[in-house]
Amino acid sequence: MSIARRTTLSKFLIEQQRETNNLPADLRLLIEVVARACKAISYNVSKGALGDALGTAGSENVQGEVQKKLDILSNEILLDANEWGGNLAAMASEEMETFFPIPANYPRGEYLLVFDPLDGSSNIDVNVSIGTIFSVLRCPDGKQATEESFLQPGTQQVAAGYAVYGPQTVFVLTTGNGVNCFTLDREVGSWVLTQSNMQIPADTREYAINASNARHWYDPVKRYVDELNAGKDGPRGDNFNMRWIASMVADVHRILNRGGIFMYPADKRTPDRPGKLRLMYEANPMAFIVEQAGGAATTGTQRIMEVQPTGLHQRVPVFLGSKNEVERVTAYHHESQ
């Protein structure tokens, strides 16, 4: 692909704005700012030990998880990049207990940005792919946001995406009109369109789950995974392979490219906590992307994007990916009720 004929993220968004007329200028600018912040995060991730950013920060986030230095740095990069542009009313992050209103000395816009600044951060120190996940909502209260403003079901998202910081740095985006992937050209500093209208195969022979928790699973998940593990001689009549990176962005990106099902179920260890992944800035944006690519995403009993949030850091079980497999494991949950 010659440099002259490449489609950059900026060009793609401008063309989408012109052709479909469903991408407001403020939303286009917001997406570009988020993508620019992801470039800065990618740069800091790639420096590794040379950047003195590895290891823990000696603090915990609101979930009680030990924060890595890069967790905090990535969060600050996203806040600093987005607070002054006039596109947002407020932001919320995995790393902050409450939402972040745009300071009074900056203009405010009509959108809300929710993000996990560095997903899979347990992999930072061992050089495994990690990433950033984000979701964009309209602020129902105009430009004056409250925590309640964020508590919208995923069906209200106007954009969602993620970046993967791996062998290549990629930026995957949906604005409700398909899913497209952009690769960072480090020589010129641009996001370049490399995959258009991504589609997840409806059937798959791969699944992603943390099998070390098998003894804690509820019966529907155990039944489903046991059938997969039984292979060609089992009820499915086929051999399946398990893949688990322990980085949601990396696992979902693989599924987006070649199919599969990603599962992070609730289990018996914490019956009062329905799952581990956060609805607002992990499950919802990934569900939006997966559905736009022809896949499905449920909690096991309900479409993820139809869950009514009750808090910024609410957790849900997650089953997403190839449509036929997600529908099968969801059916097993309904049968057990």
From Swiss-Prot:
Mg(2+) 2 binds at D116, D119, E282. Pfam families: FBPase, FBPase_C. It is an enzyme of class 3 (hydrolase). SUPFAM superfamilies: Carbohydrate phosphatase. Keywords: Carbohydrate metabolism, Cytoplasm, Hydrolase, Magnesium, Metal-binding. Its EC number is 3.1.3.11. It is found in: Cytoplasm. Mg(2+) 1 binds at E94, D116, L118. Substrate binds at D119, G120, S121, S122, N210, K276. Pathway: Carbohydrate biosynthesis; gluconeogenesis. GO terms for biological process: fructose 1,6-bisphosphate metabolic process; fructose 6-phosphate metabolic process; fructose metabolic process; gluconeogenesis; sucrose biosynthetic process. Its cofactor is Mg(2+). Its main location: cytoplasm. It catalyses: beta-D-fructose 1,6-bisphosphate + H2O = beta-D-fructose 6-phosphate + phosphate. Belongs to the FBPase class 1 family. Homotetramer. NCBIfam families: PRK09293.1-1, PRK09293.1-3, PRK09293.1-4. This is Fructose-1,6-bisphosphatase class 1.
